[in-house]
């Protein structure tokens, strides 16, 4: 998320037609990898505590790896690094730090370096205070490929451009949530239900700071899991969300 004048904008990316969710506009992201569990190295790069993160997500352990995955995926997919130098100074990906981190990103995408190696070499400290759990969606059981997806909201750092990777992602845009929904309704962009519902969930907030502050200390129990259900009505599949009539 970023603040643009009086409007809050969200970053959407278009998936390649050759990838999962091809041609759809989605949020940057991906799966949690085993390398996202920094374990003994975590305190060197973050104020995250795995116990607290796990409580926030209502999981038994490994909660901090979700935040690490969020940071890593944003860097891989759109070149945004949600981190500072350990001395507190901002990383300038527009100018002085640009070439070095462009090289890191290319090597990370091609599996020639790990994200932990980058963090160790550059002595990075994650901007975790501005990354908050936002929603939790589970793929309905009628699908053969199912996902258990945690969505996070993160504030865009200053002095960083966004650049989609050009492989899995073919386009990216900053747009207000309401304008994105309008474009989807008009058929200008394609998106699936979790994306549109997450966008609608931002409508009650006037600024990025307001939204981040609201979700900062919410536990998973306050962020209800959303499992869409589908039933055939007159030979056609109809979807229901929790709270809709006929959901149970």
Regions found by a protein language model. Give the residues of each.
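N-terminal leader/linker segments that precede catalytic domains of diphosphate-processing enzymes
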Residues: 1-248
